[in-house]
Amino acid sequence: MKTVSIFDIYLNKIKLNSKINIQGWVRNRRRSKLGLLFIDLYDGSCLYTMQVVVKDILSNYDSEISKLSVGCSINVFGVLISSIGTKQKYEIQAKVVKVIGIINNPGSYPISSKYHTMKHLRNVPHLRSRTNFFGAVSRVRNYLFNALHEFLFKNGYYWIPSPIITGLNSEGAGDMFKVSILDLNNIPKNKNGKINFKKDFFGKEAFLTVSGQLTLETYACSLSKVYSFGPIFRAENSNTRRHLSEFWMLEVETAFSNLCDIIKFSENMLKYAIGIILDKCVIDINFFRENVDEKIFCRLKDFSSKQFFQIEYKEAINILIKSNRFDHKVMFIGMELSSDHERFLVEEYFKFPLVITNYPKSLKAFYMRVNDDNKTVSAMDVLVPGVGEIIGGSEREERLNVLDRRFFELNLNKEDYWWYRDLRKYGTIPHSGFGLGFERLLSYILGIKNIRDVCPFPRTAYKADF
């Protein structure tokens, strides 16, 4: 007897009156006066449940089946038929029901009722994927992940695994998690009283990466088109709906390319991925239309069909000043755009995805290429409504003398970056790249305001229980 998924059935891959085997968890159950038990079975393959009709004549009906409650797992052998009910298209007439996992105290099951607040579900991330909401998030996340890989593969990019542990801070800033095996109760010290990291595992300070960009550039300077896709870590104690301490980043590096190239490429990539979601995830997107954002289909179709707006940083500042929404006394060329500034621009002024380019070099990292004015860098950020920045990118500084000057200006030791400088010594090339915050993109697509609700096990300050 063939084991099938509920999704296979709704894709019409299974013929009616076929003998099948289906497995999953009880989502709901109800008895009839005719000696029948109706079980709504859920297996995670899609949003739908499958109604299983069980007669009380089965040998284990009284001893096991009648005691089933929400969350119990079962294995059903039966016949697939058209349902005579109006709430479902199919049902299974059960011939055998094997109880796999019972819940002895149904009242203790944390997600037994039909509705729970997000606050409650954030406290049970190990179980919340069993709800419709988080099941749908997980399926869309999977399709989005694969769509991005697919787009890059079709465009000739090679996936390169970037290291999780590093001795450098790619952004030239702090907020990094340290990696150490030193005994916290007996930390070795130097004569000057500082920690002796030579006694540590790597013989020097080591951190969890905040970006794989620098190492990825080494392969861009040989394979031309490369990307990495994996977790990165930031020890920012930012308790906001937009920040996580561990999140996934897609980083793309392209040889012989400029800022215009990566702006166009990143926009095409986003549109391709969202097109896949609209094509492959209709059932789940419709769930979010009914429960989160009623305009989700229109919003995503507009995103896929219309060109992004594009302005320079200085124009963004002028728009903010003229809006009279912000204090003129603290608005000036060279200031950093806050999340409120970004949201005004993308949600109220342009009301559509926006690319901002040519930021002051004082606001950006050492590796971004300095423009001819020596005041700005050839950089870009992509902002989307409801989320803010989802992509940051730039041309990379390929001129060794300019790169060394940036190290000096930012008080960075260029010797720490000796291998990065080698790329400029030996056959340097113009190249560009960008990083995409995966969870932020998923938040935008689904219209979910809190980034913790699109991540299976969100890591934030004081939250690492699982």
Swiss-Prot record:
Biological process annotations from GO: asparaginyl-tRNA aminoacylation
**Which EC class, in a word?**
ligase
Q: Which reaction does it catalyse?
A: tRNA(Asn) + L-asparagine + ATP = L-asparaginyl-tRNA(Asn) + AMP + diphosphate + H(+)
List where in the cell it is found: Cytoplasm
| Record has Metal-binding as a keyword | no
> Would you tell me the Gene Ontology cellular component terms?
cytoplasm
Q: Does the keyword Ligase apply?
A: yes
Q: Name one Pfam family in it.
A: tRNA-synt_2
Subunit structure and binding partners: Homodimer.
Return the similarity comment. Answer: Belongs to the class-II aminoacyl-tRNA synthetase family.
Its protein name is: Asparagine--tRNA ligase
Q: Which gene encodes it?
A: asnS
